[in-house]
Amino acid sequence: MYDDYLTIALSKGTLLEPTLEVFKKLKLPGEGINDKSRSMVFTYDNERVKYIMCRPTDVPTYVEQGAADLGIVGKDVIVEQARDVFEMVDLQYGYCRFVVAVPEAIKNITLKDLNYKRAATKFPVIAENFFRSQGLQVEIIKLHGNIELAPLMGLADMIVDLVSTGRTLKENRLVELIKIMDSTTRLICNRVSYRTKHQQIQPLIENMQKLSTGGSA
């Protein structure tokens, strides 16, 4: 049965508040949504819009599988997962960067000195692709949190991680060696939904593009 609601997967956490600010400017509904709510689905019948609250790493899966028509998620997650979705708009917020960071004690090493070393990361695909592109053989150690601990405990020689202010690196006596890529928040779209709900989706895309380039929706 065809569902005429536009379903949007929202990333919980730091991206939620700026996303709701964008929706407010676009005159999209958002009453009652906050990161502390236990509700996972918010439905607005008058506007025919439905939001689902997801962990950021789950957003591309919901969109790819058609459980959501659209999703709001960081570029880092998109690149790491390589899901079969359309990337529609760079929303220009939630900026951070992927970096290779090493202990302060070896801050003067060069990129080629990383050959045959070990890198801890939550993003093994991005890390492996980067080192391979540089012609380096690096052992990737996947962790799920506290990446900065790995060099301190001798588990890894370096880390590959997302950085915004750099404060966490400094607190753990790590320094940025090289930037791999920038990451900002993106609007992604299910491939089938883009065709079947084009009349609902395309105006939203165009208005988001206007906002992201400094215009008004």
UniProtKB/Swiss-Prot annotation:
Keyword Nucleotide-binding on entry: yes
Its localization reads: Cytoplasm
EC code? 2.4.2.17
This protein's pathway reads:
Amino-acid biosynthesis; L-histidine biosynthesis; L-histidine from 5-phospho-alpha-D-ribose 1-diphosphate: step 1/9
Q: Which GO molecular function annotations are given, in alphabetical order?
A: ATP binding; ATP phosphoribosyltransferase activity
UniProt domain comment: Lacks the C-terminal regulatory region which is replaced by HisZ.
Instruction: Report what the protein is called.
Output: ATP phosphoribosyltransferase
Gene coding for it: hisG
